[in-house]
Amino acid sequence: MRTPKHDLPEAVAKRIPIYYRYFKLLETDGIERIKSEQLAKLVAIPSATIRRDFSYIGDLGRSGYGYEVSHLIQIFSAVLKADILTKMAVIGVGNLGRALIENNFRRNDNLQITCAFDTNPALVGQTLNGVPIYAIDQLATVIPAAGITTAISTVPSEASQRSAEQLIDAGITSILNFAPTRLQVPRHINVRYLDLTAELQTLLLFEE
C-alpha cells in the first residue's frame, strides 16, 4: 500500500482535509488570521497536535502571530491537489452507490463521479444524475479511455476482491472500499476502507 505524499504519517494525512475545510470556512467568514489555540477549538484537535501536524509540511506560522488563512489554504490546496479535477468511478449502483452518485461531491469542485458500473442489466445503459451506468465487463475499456485512476467500490464483501482485481486491471490505482473485507492488492495500489457498520458500533460504545 502506498504511503501519503510529503512523507506524512497516515494519522496526519487524515487530518489535513479537515484543516483545509475549516480554513476555507474561515476565509468565507472573512477571517484573515487565526492562532493554533483558536483553531483547536474549531476542529476539536489539540493545539499541540495541530502544530506538530503543520510541521510535517513546513514552517506555516509564526509564534505569537498565528496562521494566515489565505496562505494555509494555498498550502493545503497544493498538498491535496485541490486545484486538479479528480474523476472517479463508482462500482455498484445499489442504495449506497446511488446515494453517492446523487450527491456527487457537490461541495467539492475538484471531485467528480463521471461513470458507474453494475452487474444488473436493468441499470446498464441508464444515466443517474448525469452519470452513465455501464456493465462491469466494460471496465477495461471505459476506465482507461476516461483517464480515471480512482474508484469507489460499494459492492458486497463477497464481490469486493474480484471487483478490485478488475479495477486494477483497468488501471485504477486508488480504491475507496465500503466493504469490510481486506483486499489483497499489489503494494503500489492505495486502498482505504470505510465500514459504516463498524463506525456505528464504535459510536455506540460511547453511548451512555
Curated annotation (Swiss-Prot):
One GO biological process term: response to redox state
- Residues reported to bind NAD(+): 92-97
GO CC list: cytoplasm
Stored Gene3D superfamilies? NAD(P)-binding Rossmann-like Domain (3.40.50.720), Winged helix-like DNA-binding domain superfamily/Winged helix DNA-binding domain (1.10.10.10)
Main location as per UniProt: cytoplasm
Top-level division of the source organism's lineage: Bacteria
Keyword Repressor among UniProt keywords:
yes
TM stretches of this protein = none
Q: Where in the cell is it found?
A: Cytoplasm
Family under the similarity heading: Belongs to the transcriptional regulatory Rex family.
> Main role?
Modulates transcription in response to changes in cellular NADH/NAD(+) redox state.
Instruction: State how it assembles.
Output: Homodimer.
Task: Check the record and name the NCBIfam families matching this protein.
Answer: PRK05472.1-3 (NF003989), PRK05472.1-5 (NF003991), PRK05472.2-3 (NF003994), PRK05472.2-4 (NF003995), PRK05472.2-5 (NF003996)
Name this polypeptide is given: Redox-sensing transcriptional repressor Rex
UniProt organism field: Latilactobacillus sakei subsp. sakei (strain 23K)
Q: What is this organism's lineage?
A: Bacteria, Bacillati, Bacillota, Bacilli, Lactobacillales
List the gene name: rex
